[in-house]
Amino acid sequence: MPSGLNDRGFHLTLSLPTVGRQLLTGLLWLCLLSGCAEPDTGPDQLTEYLERLERVTGVSIPPHTPFPSALDLPRVTVPTPPESNQIDLIDFLLLSGCELQVNLGRRNTQLGRTASPSQRLLLDLEFIQLVPACSALLRERGNPELATTLELASKGHQQILPISIANAILLGPEWEAFWERPKALALYPANTSSQIIAALSQLTALSSRWLATRSLADDWAAGNRKFELLLSELRAGDGGALVMAYSIVARDISRATAMLISMNETAPLCPFGQETERSKAFDNIVSRFFVGDIQPWLVALRQRKELLLAPVNQLERPLRDAMPEQYAQWTDERDQLLSRHTAVIKKHISAIQIALSGCARS
């Protein structure tokens, strides 16, 4: 009797006892055979579904709610502690013959003082990498005091490295662009690729290596161009589109569910236990618009979430303690939205089942 709605990660059973059951079964087989190809107008299909439900249920569509501001990435930064063990001009001149002198020179230029967080991070990494060789040279020259000053400065940079990495990656303009909401979802998620997944994974690998090998100078090497290119790829990421899509789904499916609950309480489809023309129309709307159009899009969104969120969490997790509280609150809001998708759909399916449960075939 029942036909099944399958989404990876959960199984939902939708009982449609009228003639539309055959159409539903056919649509499900089509979905399986075609790989559940993503529709290109998910939000529009949700709107059409709501409008058709309004006509058949006689219940007005609940008010439209705006996108929650709590789901927008907060614009915050983590202040970097001031450097101790400063190198003065005389010490700088004594570094002749050390590659580190070039690094310090770049830091003290106008460009160095106004460098982006990502460029400052690369300068810090280079500084840490170059200190051991320069320190050894200074000790050979009989200047252990300056060597010790450099070593202490290097340790200071290492201690604040989580903050430096967080400012460069998770609080930088590229990450902000990654989570920026698009004006419209258009073909999303059919218009995405695996390139952003690869970029996130590579950034995570770099960050993890920098954090895990603090005592190994040879492991600090960072290709400036590679790092900046990876950051630039974040600008084309679809984090904002994913959150926007899930917010729309949660809002509109919840609105549809509220309409069905109201109908079931005040004007059931089959008040005398037999199917009606109204129940048949409702059956057709669910089969055609929810199962045939919306459900494949929901499956595609879930698949994209699983692909995207895993590397995002891997990148964020080691840096969480270095992030401001506002960012932690935002990630909680974001992840709660993305995780309650299944519950929202299940509740809607349950409302559909209840609506048709008293409609025996005549």
Which residues does each PLM region occupy?
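N-terminal Sec/ER secretory leader and immediately downstream segment
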Residues: 40-194
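Polar/charged alpha-helical tracts
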Residues: 47-51, 55, 132, 136, ...
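Bacterial N-terminal signal peptides that target proteins for export
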Residues: 5-24
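A cross-kingdom marker for long, charged
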Residues: 39-64, 233-362
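Sec-dependent N-terminal signal peptides
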Residues: 25-31
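C-terminal motif of bacterial Sec signal peptides marking the signal peptidase cleavage site
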Residues: 33-35
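Extended, low-hydrophobicity segments enriched in charged/polar residues
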Residues: 155-261
